[in-house]
């Protein structure tokens, strides 16, 4: 595939939205609005046969009426009209068409499948590449192109190709709450022309993309895709969520994007052999993306854990070991430094994970948590350091705020000088209606925001942190 075709899609000098409506509830209206809201710098041409203006922009009855060339078309017209549109696209020199248009093969109707075949033949005849049909298209913060409301306007390192528009929107919204930012996102639907392999190959060579994530319901050419995936994982991490794993899921896939799901066990084995990371939920994918985007390579299993309280320390030991890490004993030099700060009666309790909550108040207020974290981060005995932020200590509001503020400032300082991977576990709660104004959850959310702004990976639970970071370990051991 000529790479410049997708370069045109992601860096178009002009975009036409065909079927642009004045109905504010329509997707076609939103596509035009997003180009304006997100600051697209190229020319925007709404195509509407009955209106002269849309959102302050001059409209045109057809592509043929546009005086200049058009690079990229977003098609929002009924499927039977698409072949004629492609003829107009050819005349205007359009290189890529995003078919938001649906109701094709995914309907299961014979006539819809025949129309889809005609559309593909027409596109190939004219040398036009298609994204879709039945998809949301492209989100490119660098260019100011978006298919969703309230997506981040600033770019980042994560590139995505998702077969589902709904899943891609959900992922962008929730991952952005964790601080993730995006290079390019493609919702590609039925993959009539450009498919998962094309998008993977493009993102693998894209300098703006450092990590790749994909949600797929089926693959058009398994051998070709796996070959491209193996080549890509040699240079960039790829995280894959395969939907349609069971009987009901397979049925849903067929009606959603007209994909053949295939055997998940075969999928799983093949994907893992390429060096890609296979996840099972969007939440696990977000955790993995946070880890790959912000952690340096994790090259060993020796983990040091500080803080969290007694029960959390015990759970930490279990859950890190169950995930495949080794909660190694504290080295003598760190134990010796801690014994200088606490009375002898506490010496027998100084172990990894280090639970400062059982130590005297003087250890808390002196910042011993941060000092231990710093020593672990500098020690050759650990490959990875985890800060469990204590959210339920035996103290009141003012004391808790002061203590956690101190912890977070210590973490920020250590991160600035870090010599090994550092991550944080901070539970900001699952909020009910009455909790949003509670000082505790508001304060913890502020601390999480501070940490993510510094590109420190933050996880809501120990188990999520351990599983996600183990994905990083697995990837770098293979590559």
What are these regions (language model features)?
Residues 1-479:
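Catalytic-core regions of core metabolic enzymes
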